Design a protein with these regions (language model features):
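Membrane-integral, polyisoprenol-dependent glycosyltransferases
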Residues: 1-299, 303-384
Length: 384
């Protein structure tokens, strides 16, 4: 299947600028005339929903303060410092905070300026599934995918705060889009681009970004048009290498800076960003040993200390199991998405059972993503 470049009709030479702007609303020649206007309308409605009342939005004060400090000093910006003096970092990688800090540097410290990046990220995320799904099943299905994502409650909620999940979702959806393009052509550059997107997502949410890797790799190995399995495995290995390099680039750079010239790394007893990411924000989240050792504690940690125990799924009565997302407080928040994903995957399999090629990768991709997320949710004591 050949991918046709998406180019809108070029305006006539010498046309006024306002007419050139209007061409952005016109669909490319290979799509129905209603496709792009409908997509932009969906994204606009989503942006309004995400940004409504953002001047009085509820934000995380700890990370809001860090973004403000980072906006006032390039030194603090580089290292993700929590305080203006640059003595201690935040307890996570600062990828999402970089975007927020730039917004605050441009517009000044306002709640709406802190939330604005998440609104933009959420609106941009709506555009990407359309392109990925359209390649496989056409523009109508792409619009349905964009609309479903736009009205998903958790998507709206994430776009109305200052948590890092909005950037994580945008980058992972871009990775899935690049992978879908690679599936159709066997393009190594597209697969490497997917690795770059996942690596950047790691800067926003650390190991959670890697949960998508098994699904993306399995989809390419099973459905890419490369003639030999050895070739596909080599492509996946190269993409994995790119992911690792991009993921670990900032951590390595910080580790090379002498400790006296940078802030102390919060979340680590040994001033190591690797300990912060892979222990405090990794293994420690599974074992319950994840109390910050340097920076100011979050309200959740204060409550944990006062009660004498951490607020984990296990201590709240939610036992580890493969169906944990379908029970308790998780069911109302996100559990309903899993049956919908499985039903959608089965529907694709039934509808496309006679069609060979990349469109049949939808089932392993969906199931792989669901399996990765379920394995995380089934951990013995992962925190809420």
């Amino acid at each position: 299947m050949e991918i046709i470049p998406e180019k809108a009709p070029a305006p006539a030479p010498g046309a006024p600028r306002w007419r050139r702007f209007l061409t952005l609303w016109r669909s490319p020649a290979d799509q129905p005339a209603w496709a792009r206007p409908a997509l932009l309308a969906i994204a606009a409605v989503a942006a309004v929903a995400y940004g409504w009342g953002m001047a009085s939005a509820s934000v995380e004060p700890f990370y809001g303060a860090a973004a403000r400090s980072m906006s006032e000093s390039w030194h603090d910006f580089m290292f993700g410092a929590f305080d203006p003096a640059g003595t201690v970092t935040v307890d996570k990688l600062p990828g999402a905070l970089w975007v927020q800090a730039l917004s605050l540097r441009v517009f000044g410290f306002h709640i709406w300026a802190l939330v604005l990046p998440q609104v933009v990220e959420g609106a941009l995320t709506i555009l990407v599934p359309y392109r990925a799904v359209r390649r496989l099943t056409g523009p109508a299905a792409g619009l349905i995918a964009a609309a479903v994502l736009a009205v998903t409650p958790i998507t709206v909620l994430l776009g109305r705060g200052n948590v890092s999940d909005s950037l994580l979702i945008l980058l992972l959806v871009l990775a899935a889009d690049a992978t879908s393009a690679a599936l159709l052509t066997g393009s190594l550059p597209q697969l490497l681009l997917a690795g770059v997107w996942v690596g950047l997502a790691f800067q926003a949410k650390m190991i959670q970004a890697w949960l998508a890797l098994p699904a993306l790799a399995a989809a390419y190995l099973l459905a890419a048009p490369a003639t030999r399995l050895r070739t596909r495995c080599a492509h996946v290995a190269l993409a994995g290498l790119v992911t690792a390099v991009v993921s670990l680039s900032w951590m390595t750079a910080v580790s090379l800076v002498p400790s006296q010239d940078r802030p102390y790394v919060d979340g680590s007893p040994d001033d190591s960003v690797y300990t912060q990411v892979f222990d405090y924000n990794g293994v420690g989240r599974l074992t319950g040993n994840w109390v910050s050792v340097a920076g100011p504690p979050s309200p959740l940690l204060v409550a944990a200390k006062e009660s004498g125990r951490l607020l984990t799924a296990e201590t709240m009565g939610i036992k580890p199991s493969w169906h944990r997302l379908l029970a308790g407080p998780f069911a109302a928040g996100s559990g309903w998405l899993l049956p919908a994903a499985v039903a959608g995957a089965l529907g694709v399999l039934i509808a496309r059972r006679r069609q060979a090629g990349a469109t049949r990768c939808a089932l392993p991709s969906c199931c792989g993503a669901a399996g990765s997320w379920s394995s995380r949710s089934s951990s013995a004591s992962a925190p809420i």
